[in-house]
C-alpha cells in the first residue's frame, strides 16, 4: 500500500520542481539540473526504473528551461544595451512615416509618394519589431567614413551588416503584408512596443541561436554596428 502511494507523490514532486523553475533565472535552473544529475549519478543502481525515467524527463525539461532563461537574459541585455539607439531611431522613423503619410493624403495618386510611404512604414515596423535576441542593426547608422580609407576587413564587415539589415527588413515587409508582425503598424501608431516576453521578428532559428551564443556573450568590447 505504501509502495503504491510513493510513485504518484514522486511524480507530483518532480512536476512541482519543474514548475518552480519556469520563468526563473539561469542560476536557479542550473542548480536544479546539477541536483538531478547528481541524484541519477549516485543512485541510478538503486532507483526504480520508473523514477529514473521520470528524472531523465525532468532533466530534459530543465535543460529546455535553461535555454529559454539564457535567451531571456540575452533579450534583457540587448534591450538595455540598445535602448537609446532604438529610441532615437523609432522617433526618426515615426517622423518620416507621418511626413510621408501627409504627402499621400495630399496627392493620393502620386506613385512616388506611395512608394515613399511604403518604405517609411517598413522602416518603422523594423525598428519596433527587430528581434531582441540579435545585435541591433541601425537603419540610420552614423559615422559615414570615406570608403577609400577603410580596410578590406572593415569593408567586408560593413557589407555583411548591410546584407543582414536588408534581410531583416525584407522579413519585416513580408510579415507586414501577411499581418503577422509581433507589433502591427496600427499598434505602433498607438504607442505599443514589443512585449518583454516577445522576441520580435526572427530569421532561421540557427541564425538566432548563433547570435545568442556566439555574439551576445563574447563581443562586449566589439564596436556596435550603429557606430560603424
Curated annotation (Swiss-Prot):
One of its GO terms (cellular component) is preribosome, small subunit precursor. Residues 197-228 are annotated as: Disordered. InterPro entries: Efg1, EFG1_rRNA-proc. The gene is EFG1. It comes from Kluyveromyces lactis (strain ATCC 8585 / CBS 2359 / DSM 70799 / NBRC 1267 / NRRL Y-1140 / WM37). GO terms for biological process: maturation of SSU-rRNA from tricistronic rRNA transcript (SSU-rRNA, 5.8S rRNA, LSU-rRNA). This is rRNA-processing protein EFG1. Belongs to the EFG1 family. Residues 203-212, 219-228 have a biased composition (Acidic residues). Residues 26-74 form a coiled coil. Disulfide bonds: none annotated. Involved in rRNA processing. It holds the Pfam family Efg1. Keywords: Coiled coil, Nucleus, rRNA processing. It is found in: Nucleus, Nucleolus. Its main location: nucleus.
Amino acid at each position: 500500500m505504501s509502495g503504491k502511494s510513493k510513485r504518484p507523490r514522486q511524480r507530483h514532486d518532480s512536476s512541482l520542481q519543474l514548475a518552480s523553475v519556469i520563468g526563473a533565472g539561469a542560476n536557479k535552473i542550473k542548480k536544479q539540473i546539477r541536483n538531478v544529475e547528481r541524484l541519477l549519478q549516485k543512485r541510478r543502481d538503486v532507483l526504480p526504473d520508473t523514477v529514473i525515467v521520470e528524472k531523465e524527463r525532468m532533466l530534459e525539461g530543465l535543460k529546455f528551461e535553461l535555454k529559454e532563461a539564457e535567451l531571456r537574459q540575452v533579450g534583457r541585455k540587448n534591450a538595455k544595451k540598445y535602448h537609446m539607439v532604438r529610441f532615437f531611431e523609432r522617433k526618426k522613423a515615426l517622423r518620416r512615416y507621418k511626413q510621408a503619410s501627409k504627402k499621400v493624403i495630399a496627392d493620393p495618386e502620386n506613385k512616388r509618394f506611395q512608394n515613399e510611404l511604403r518604405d517609411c512604414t517598413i522602416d518603422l515596423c523594423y525598428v519596433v519589431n527587430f528581434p531582441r535576441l540579435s545585435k541591433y542593426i541601425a537603419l540610420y547608422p552614423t559615422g559615414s567614413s570615406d570608403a577609400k580609407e577603410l580596410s578590406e576587413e572593415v569593408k567586408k564587415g560593413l557589407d555583411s551588416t548591410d546584407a543582414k539589415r536588408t534581410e531583416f527588413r525584407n522579413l519585416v515587409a513580408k510579415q507586414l503584408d501577411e499581418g503577422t508582425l509581433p507589433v502591427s503598424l496600427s499598434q505602433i501608431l498607438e504607442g505599443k512596443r514589443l512585449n518583454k516576453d516577445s522576441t520580435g521578428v526572427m530569421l532561421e532559428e540557427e541564425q538566432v541561436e548563433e547570435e545568442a551564443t556566439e555574439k551576445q556573450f563574447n563581443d562586449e568590447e566589439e564596436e556596435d554596428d550603429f557606430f560603424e
